[in-house]
Amino acid sequence: MINGTALILGALVTLVGMPQFINYFRVRNEGQMIREEGPKWHQKKSGTPTMGGMVFIIAIIIASLVTGVIFHGAKVSLLMLLFVLVEFGLIGCWDDSIKLLKRQNEGFKAWQKLLGQIIGGLIFFLVIKETGVALQLNIPGLGIWHLGGWYALFVIFWLTGFSNAVNLSDGLDGLVAGLSTIAFGTYAIIAAHQQNIPVMIFCMAVVGSMLGFLVFNHKPAKIFMGDMGSLALGGALAAVSILLNQELSLILIGIVFVLETLSVILQVLSFKLTGHRIFKMSPIHHHFEMLGWSEWKVDIVFWIVGLIGSIITLISIL
């Protein structure tokens, strides 16, 4: 009942709000500028409405709070997840707004985005520390590592790293929305197993909102989530793993996000050290496009990889 309410509310609010938001951009003749360094055939997407993350963030907030208040009360953990979602979403919103105003694909400077992410991560840590969250990591094969105050650095790194990882992965229609549905759905199952109702409510609200968003974001996308959506989802995903004390599970559940990020790092290092590129283009989803794969094929294969990582995680935890 609780799961269904959060999921349905998230989907309904997104389905109702997104058409109006798309129409707003079309009337103003504004949209996403596509970077010239990407695949040439992506240029036809230029002008597609963006910042769809604004709608599904609102949908997640409404679905989470309504379901939380009705069934369980708005607990601190639920409010902190919403804080991370909104704070990281606002960073992306500012970034997207600059791009739209300048009509180019360059927004925030890297240090400005990083500063906002660090502040968000630090606030999240300070609050969860007071709620009694264990400041430790359960590392398979190595046991439990008690980090104490050093856990703050881990939290900041985790939220910042995964928000940027999801952001890097958002280069194909429907890719991140599908992967996020799988990842948050997996954490909803883990939260239910732990009887952590607030986190379960939040995760199901995200799943519902993502399913609603996919109606408009599948190829050919009628709207993009923008940095507002991808940064918010990545930060929230990391925060969920922390509140469930399953931080390192995100490496498998979010395996595609990890691989996308590693492909960029390896590409840059290889080119600087040897003058040669490992991939035809990075992030790695573009590499497969350059090999002749359609966007749908990349989406489906990457979704399957994400699903396999999630299934392995569930088998090991439950």
From Swiss-Prot:
Example of a GO cellular component annotation carried by this entry: plasma membrane
Instruction: Tell me which CDD domains the record gives.
Output: GT_MraY
Q: What class of enzyme is it?
A: transferase
Q: In which pathway does it act?
A: Cell wall biogenesis; peptidoglycan biosynthesis
Identify the PROSITE patterns for this entry.
MRAY_2 (PS01348)
Subcellular location(s) of the protein: Cell membrane
Its domain of life reads Bacteria
* An example Gene Ontology biological process: peptidoglycan biosynthetic process
List where the protein spans the membrane. 2-22, 51-71, 74-94, 114-134, 139-159, 172-192, 196-216, 223-243, 251-271, 298-318
Q: Does the keyword Secreted apply?
A: no
InterPro entries per UniProt:
Glycosyl_transferase_4, PNAcMuramoyl-5peptid_Trfase, PNAcMuramoyl-5peptid_Trfase_CS
Identify the EC number(s).
2.7.8.13
- Give the record's membrane topology: Multi-pass membrane protein
List the GO molecular function terms: metal ion binding; phospho-N-acetylmuramoyl-pentapeptide-transferase activity
Sorted alphabetically, which keywords does the UniProt record give? Cell cycle, Cell division, Cell membrane, Cell shape, Cell wall biogenesis/degradation, Magnesium, Membrane, Metal-binding, Peptidoglycan synthesis, Transferase, Transmembrane, Transmembrane helix
Q: Which reaction does it catalyse?
A: UDP-N-acetyl-alpha-D-muramoyl-L-alanyl-gamma-D-glutamyl-L-lysyl-D-alanyl-D-alanine + di-trans,octa-cis-undecaprenyl phosphate = Mur2Ac(oyl-L-Ala-gamma-D-Glu-L-Lys-D-Ala-D-Ala)-di-trans,octa-cis-undecaprenyl diphosphate + UMP
Give cofactor(s), names only.
Mg(2+)
Q: Which PANTHER family match?
A: PHOSPHO-N-ACETYLMURAMOYL-PENTAPEPTIDE-TRANSFERASE, PHOSPHO-N-ACETYLMURAMOYL-PENTAPEPTIDE-TRANSFERASE HOMOLOG
| NCBIfam families in the record | mraY (TIGR00445)
Q: Which family does it belong to?
A: Belongs to the glycosyltransferase 4 family. MraY subfamily.
Question: So what does this one do?
Answer: Catalyzes the initial step of the lipid cycle reactions in the biosynthesis of the cell wall peptidoglycan: transfers peptidoglycan precursor phospho-MurNAc-pentapeptide from UDP-MurNAc-pentapeptide onto the lipid carrier undecaprenyl phosphate, yielding undecaprenyl-pyrophosphoryl-MurNAc-pentapeptide, known as lipid I.
Q: What is this protein called?
A: Phospho-N-acetylmuramoyl-pentapeptide-transferase
Q: Which gene encodes it?
A: mraY
